[in-house]
Amino acid sequence: MRSKFDEELNLLNDELTEMGDLISVRIIEAVRAFRHKDLIKAKFIMDNDEDVNEYERKIEERALKLLLRQQPVASDLRLISSALKMITDMERIGDHAVDIAEIVMTIPQVTKDETYQKIIVMADTSIEMLKESLKSFVTGDLSLVDNISRHDDRVDGFFDEVREDVVGEIRADTIGAEYAIDILMIAKYLERIGDHAENISEWVEYSITGQHVQK
């Protein structure tokens, strides 16, 4: 009976990792679409959001079956309940990739390289946070999430820089208001992705230690 449970739990871990890989790719694709005003790529992200939702449904169904059909001990219950919480944040990360893609469809111009470099760092850092959190969940190695809060602070710091840059350009009358709002919204969505990644790390910590501490 236990071997069957462990087999199903491994499948759950595999699906979580696959979902994480998918949304990581979508984030990068959305940011690159923003850089080059790539309408084809942006539309692909928007049209294929159901892929992320399907993973959420699959993982939720597997987790609930584990709860109902098996006899999980307390540590198993923490793992399963944490997975259910994590996929909610992961699905929202996928939604934010779509949000960025939707902005790309109407953005009036290609962004400046300096601003893009800050935005790509925000995206890369958020993806690193997500992947480290999922790896920690699968392996049980809590040390992998030790630096998550520091990474989130880095994302927040770059958001502040992007905002200051945009405000400066508005005052200098070098960009229009509509474009400024688009850039700020993209940066804000990436900041939220970082926040969701930090939430995931908190549920990972709970799954391992039994303590849910907000960072």
Provide a role label for each language-model segment.
Residues 1-215:
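Cytosolic, long alpha-helical scaffolding segments
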